[in-house]
Curated annotation (Swiss-Prot):
Protein name per the record: Putative 3-methyladenine DNA glycosylase
Source species of the chain: Staphylococcus aureus (strain MRSA252)
InterPro entries in alphabetical order: Formyl_transferase-like_C_sf (IPR011034), MPG (IPR003180), MPG_sf (IPR036995)
Annotated EC: 3.2.2.-
SUPFAM superfamilies on file: FMT C-terminal domain-like
UniProt-listed CDD domains: AAG
Keywords: DNA damage, DNA repair, Hydrolase
Amino acid sequence: MDFVNNDTRQIAKNLLGVKVIYQDTTQTYTGYIVETEAYLGLNDRAAHGYGGKITPKVTSLYKRGGTIYAHVMHTHLLINFVTKSEGIPEGVLIRAIEPEDGLSAMFRNRGKKGYEVTNGPGKWTKAFNIPRAIDGARLNDCRLSIDTKNRKYPKDIIASPRIGIPNKGDWTHKSLRYTVKGNPFVSRMRKSDCMFPEDTWK
């Protein structure tokens, strides 16, 4: 997947259905991306790179597309895939995963079962046992990788405003969150809108 030359919003949509693999020392975790959010850098008031701000914590966001930007929010580790050329702080937050391999280990790591195991940006990273130290690593050159060949394709994609970013003017309301319609592993999915996971893919 080209993380440098494509529009960040398009990358966020294209990532839906892509297989994520994390190879721990004793366990392999896999799953399919069902929810993403695009963050558009310098002008995006909700983005960590808004206004070109650079601090030690956000250094990875300014690296070349395909870098992993991992940051902690409210004790939860959040994983972003950096997009664009070096120096342009755009990226895609991976918000939720439909799990595949390593499910028993995910249940142990999370202390939860069912859809709650990976239906949020801090939930799936804990389920996959991903450490903060992965920040700054290159996707597919470290323990975390994506598989764009053995992937799934959503039947429908919904665009909506991003989660948890009030008071950011127009950026609060822009439809930069992308979800696989009806997939029960999407965060904050109403039960009435849920479908069987297999029915949400082509």
